[in-house]
Amino acid sequence: MGQSGRSRHQKRNRAQAQLRNLESYAAQPHSFVFTRGRAGRNVRQLSLDVRRVMEPLTATRLQVRKKNSLKDCVAVAGPLGVTHFLILTKTDNSVYLKLMRLPGGPTLTFQISKYTLIRDVVSSLRRHRMHEQQFNHPPLLVLNSFGPQGMHIKLMATMFQNLFPSINVHTVNLNTIKRCLLINYNPDSQELDFRHYSVKVVPVGASRGMKKLLQEKFPNMSRLQDISELLATGVGLSDSEVEPDGEHNTTELPQAVAGRGNMQAQQSAVRLTEIGPRMTLQLIKIQEGVGNGNVLFHSFVHKTEEELQAILAAKEEKLRLKAQRQNQQAENLQRKQELREAHKKKSLAGIKRARARADGDSDAEDPGAPPEAVGAGQPEDEEDDAEYFRQAVGEEPDEDLFPTAAKRRRQGGPLGKKQRGKEQRPGNKGRGQGGNWQALKLQGRSQRGKAKPRPRATHQDSRPASRRRN
C-alpha cells in the first residue's frame, strides 16, 4: 500500500501558509464597536449594524457590561491586536459616535444627526441583495470630497482609511470586493454621509432576455411559443427588472470575476445596492489620547491664545504633580525595602549570637531537649538536694522535685515504705527466688472469699435521726 496522508513537504508548506495567513491577519486593523451608558434600543441596534459594516475584522459577539470601564476595554484590546474603538452614546440632545485610535489616540467625536437602520433600508427597497458571503471580506472604502480644506479634514480622512486594510489595485482580487463603504463630505454643511452598498458585476451588451437566461433563476416561458421571443423582445419580463447601464457604471474588467458572462477584458457594469445603515455625521471635536486629552479642534468652541496657554500650563502642572507623587512613592518603597533588609540582617545576627551563647554555656538548658537530657549534666547536685530535703523535712521528696534522684532511687537506691513492707512479709519471695507464687496468690483469693461480709445498712438506718419514726 502507498503512503497515506500528506508528505513532509506538503505539511511544511501547509504550516508555512497558515503562519503567513495568521501574520497577515494580525497586521490588519481590528475594531471594537459598542455602546456606553443608557443608549436605548435603537442605538444598540445601530451599533450592531455598524458592527456588521466592520465585519470580519471586528468582534461580532462583543458584550460590554455596565461595570466595564473604558480602561478595561483598552487593557483587553492590547493583547487582541485591536486598533480602533467605535463607541456610540446617547444624551438628551443627540446621539454621538466616538472614533478612537489605540493606544495613543487621537479621538474624533461625531454627532449623528440622522440615522437609518439596516432593516429600514432593506424594507424600503423593491429588490435587495444581501447574503452572508458578502461579509467574509472587508468593504471597499470610498472617500469623496475630502479635499485640502483643513488639517481636521485630513485627519478625518486618515482615520477612516486606517479603519480598513489597505488595497493594492494591481494585485487585489476582484472576487473579494463584495461591499462598498462610501463616506461623502459636504463642505457647505460640514457633514458626512455614511452609506453602505452591495457590489454586483454584470455583463453589458446583452439583451434583457439573455441576461435573464444567464441568471441562476430560470425565467417562466410557459406563455412563449419560441425562445426567440424572449431573446428578441423580452416578453414576460416586468419593468422593475429593467436596470439601465451607461458610461457611469460600465468598465472593462482586468480579470475574470465570479458570475456568468464576466470575462476578462470584457465590458461589465458595476451595480450598487444599498444595504444600510445610513448615517449623517458632523465632526464636533478632536482630542489627544483616548478620550481624555487636550482638545485639538472644536467646531463650536474657539479658544484664544491666552486660554490655550493657560490650559497647557495647567496640564503641565498636573503632569508635574503626578511625576512627583510617583517619585515619592518609589522612594517610600525603596525605604521600606531597606528597612526590611536591615531588620532581616539584625534578626539573623541575633539568632547567631543566641546560638553561640548556647554552645558556650554548658549549664544552659536547651528548651527542646528531653527531661533526661536536661538532668544528665547535674545528677550529683540533685542527689545532694534530695538528701538535704530529707534531713530538713523528715520526709521523702516528691518525684517531681528531683526526677533524676527518684529515678536513681528506683533503679538501685533505698526502698520505699511499701517495698520494705513487702520484703518484710513472711514467706514473700520473688518469682526467681523459688517461692510458691501461685500458691500464695490462690491463698490470698481464698482468704478474700472467706472474709465476713459487712452488714448492709437498712433504709431506716441510713436516714437522719431526726426523720426516724419512733
UniProtKB/Swiss-Prot annotation:
One of its GO terms (biological process) is rRNA processing. PROSITE patterns: BRIX (PS50833). The modification N6-acetyllysine is found at residue 441. InterPro entries: Brix, PPAN-like. Coiled coil: none annotated. Residues 342-355, 447-457 have a biased composition (Basic residues). Residues 240-264, 323-470 are annotated as: Disordered. The modification Phosphoserine is found at residues 238, 240, 362. Pfam families: Brix. May have a role in cell growth. PANTHER family: PETER PAN-RELATED, SUPPRESSOR OF SWI4 1 HOMOLOG. This is Suppressor of SWI4 1 homolog. It comes from Mus musculus.
